Amino acid sequence: MEKKELSACVPFMGFSGKRLDQILSKLFMQYSRSCLKKWIIMNNVYINGKIENQPDKKILGGEKITIYSTDEKLPINLPQNIALNTIYEDSNILIINKPPGLVVHPGAGNQDGTILNALLYRYTNISSIPRCGIIHRLDKDTSGLMVIAKTIFSYNKLVTLLKKRKIIRKYQGIIKGNMISGGIVNYPIMRHPFKRICMTTDSLGKKSITHYKIINRFKFHTHVSFRLETGRTHQIRVHMLHIGYPLLGDPLYGGIDYGCNYFQENRNIYRKFNLFRQALHADYIEFIHPFTQKVMSWSASLPQDMKDILLYLKK
């Protein structure tokens, strides 16, 4: 049987110091973790041309990983015909506008029905690209723009841009509280020691920087623009809670509603607009195109739920 080859260079950002099996699950998300671990044990995984069969091998970053396999029966993430809202597409990249509720890639609680499954259906060769071309992710209930690489060349270029903080990503959100001025939150973020699905600010965490400025103020809320300098999991949500202005509707980091009038206003919004997600939208992305080397940018207007809430708050 002809061997199938998969290869990728390990990025430094977010990968250095992690176990081999963890690295593979991030680079080759189209395959299940059990499948990847089996390939390691079966001597099908090479690091810089040498066999590595220890799943707990620590990876430094920068290594070339190659997988050879003839076992086509191992479980993989299946292609699924899921519609994607395409903003821009050429032979190198894809820009999509993700709706709230759509998961980026399979994981605990969401085994399918994800953007990754949609990409596998839409592009038959994308499984050979690490992470199926997914450069960055958005939380399940955060809407907005994402960039997908359609070639290994584009993937490596875009990952490098992301590492060097050359991809500009902006968001809009509605926060609870009347913010006085914009500013910068520069505080490390790490996994919460007890609530494993949550992140938290901690001096032992990874460097995390969020820029924010006010778009409009209301009686009990503020419409805010954010720019990410780093891209940690739940970064904007955690940083806003840290400074006392949690995102409206956030089920994990929403904070406590204080004051009778304040509580009543939030309850009215939740009921009237059926808001069960954080009011956060990735509305702008800009980077140098990996092939043409031209600066390109895209914008996506707010989803209807956030538009309706802002109209309500203006009254």
Curated annotation (Swiss-Prot):
Top-rank lineage group of the source organism: Bacteria
Major location category of this protein: cytoplasm
Enzyme class: isomerase
Record's keyword terms, sorted: Cytoplasm, Isomerase, RNA-binding, rRNA processing
Protein name, as recorded: Ribosomal large subunit pseudouridine synthase D
GO MF, one annotated term: RNA binding
InterPro entries hit by this protein: PsdUridine_synth_cat_dom_sf (IPR020103), PsdUridine_synth_RluA-like_CS (IPR006224), PsdUridine_synth_RluC/D (IPR006225), PsdUridine_synth_RsuA/RluA (IPR006145), RluA_PseudoU_synthase (IPR050188), S4_RNA-bd (IPR002942), S4_RNA-bd_sf (IPR036986)
Gene Ontology cellular-component terms listed: cytoplasm
Annotated function: Responsible for synthesis of pseudouridine from uracil at positions 1911, 1915 and 1917 in 23S ribosomal RNA.
Gene3D superfamilies per UniProt: Pseudouridine synthase (3.30.2350.10), RNA-binding S4 domain (3.10.290.10)
Organism this protein belongs to: Buchnera aphidicola subsp. Schizaphis graminum (strain Sg)
EC number, as in UniProt: 5.4.99.23
Catalytic activity, reaction form: uridine(1911/1915/1917) in 23S rRNA = pseudouridine(1911/1915/1917) in 23S rRNA
Limits of the S4 RNA-binding domain: 18-87
Localization of this protein: Cytoplasm
Entry's Gene Ontology BP terms: enzyme-directed rRNA pseudouridine synthesis
Catalytic residues (positions): 139
Family: Belongs to the pseudouridine synthase RluA family.
